[in-house]
């Protein structure tokens, strides 16, 4: 018995924002850039959500953590 494929949509590949814009150094003072990688509650978004490479995800994570220590970004964003 032949299997029928259901028509659906093809998922679009996520693009690494940092590599696409050729950002070499992720600065902890650039909170506008870092806020793209943080949820509305203040949690760091995983790679599968943001689409960043492993290397750039590590850079983003360390920059976010430094910004939190320097009080440039909140640890928790309570509304």
Swiss-Prot record:
Entry-linked InterPro entries: Ribosomal_bS18, Ribosomal_bS18_CS, Ribosomal_bS18_sf
GO biological process assignments: translation
Ligase as UniProt keyword: no
SUPFAM superfamilies assigned to the protein according to its UniProt record, in alphabetical order: Ribosomal protein S18
Any Gene Ontology CC annotation: cytosolic small ribosomal subunit
GO molecular function: small ribosomal subunit rRNA binding; structural constituent of ribosome
Pfam families reported in the protein's UniProt record: Ribosomal_S18
Keyword Ribonucleoprotein: yes
Keywords: Ribonucleoprotein, Ribosomal protein, RNA-binding, rRNA-binding
Known role: Binds as a heterodimer with protein bS6 to the central domain of the 16S rRNA, where it helps stabilize the platform of the 30S subunit.
Subunit structure: Part of the 30S ribosomal subunit. Forms a tight heterodimer with protein bS6.
Family stated for the protein in its record: Belongs to the bacterial ribosomal protein bS18 family.
Name of the protein in question: Small ribosomal subunit protein bS18
Gene: rpsR
